Amino acid sequence: YDKAVMIGTVPALVALGWRWKPARLMMASIAVLSLLSIQIYQGDLARADSAFFLKYFLSSQSAILWMSALFVLATIFYWIGLLARSESGSAIGQKLTWVAVLMGFTGLMVRWYESYLIGADVGHIPVSNLYEVFVLFSLITALLYLYYEGHYGTRSLGAFVLLVISAAVGFLMWYSVARDAQQIQPLVPALQSWWMKIHVPANFIGYGSFALSAMVSVAYLMKERGVLADRLPTLEVLDDVMYKSIAVGFAFFTIATILGALWAAEAWGGYWSWDPKETWALIVWLNYAAWLHMRLMKGLRGA
């Protein structure tokens, strides 16, 4: 299943690199750092505590710690850029965000390899628990933001979007300390399914898009009320970013919900059981469906 997932992602990555040039260097860098980590490990997980580059930079835990620190620093510099009208501050925030994404994805790839070093029966794609999906959420939200930043040519929204990412990595660090959540654990039987490998990433593309649109809507409301109005993009640009983010998120969330129902039918014998998670997924879906309907049919605009 893992090999099939990796092969299946190749066309998507090729398409991404074709349409978005910065992603090409990012993907190549992730591949180089991941392969370097595998080479340094030499098939021995204990080297994570003895090999210098693994211990301080490239083991999954170290890379994710770097990701977290860099996201927080990026948030600070984006706010400096916004409040002080400093282009250099925002530019530093942008570069730090790119490096954070690089370290985060490298950490996930290395964590995938580390799980197989523990045991072939333990190895799994790292999207199986709260620790791993919070890393994934942070990375997807950051990547989506970087795409829109480049597309619209403005860095002023980084101060808002990076706030929610910093909150996520703050929770991630607390969760690691309080629950020792960074430790790789075997999958419970219900998660030993290939559905997990496509359901979870699709879900978190949706969550990341919704989070981004929520923070852009905060900027929209501030602009509308004259707060930092001269430092933010036009209302039309903010509205367009919100709409596109919600549309992308809704599409992926719909796909993920359908995949989740199919997974539930295979694991528990029923497509829908009205448990709290499923019920709230439906509420979220209906909420965004109503918003998109009002926009497309009634011309609704704004936050």
Feature-to-residue mapping (PLM):
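P-loop NTPase nucleotide-binding/switch module
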Residues: 232
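Hydrophobic cores of alpha-helical transmembrane segments in multi-pass integral membrane proteins
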Residues: 1-50, 59-184, 191, 198-228, ...
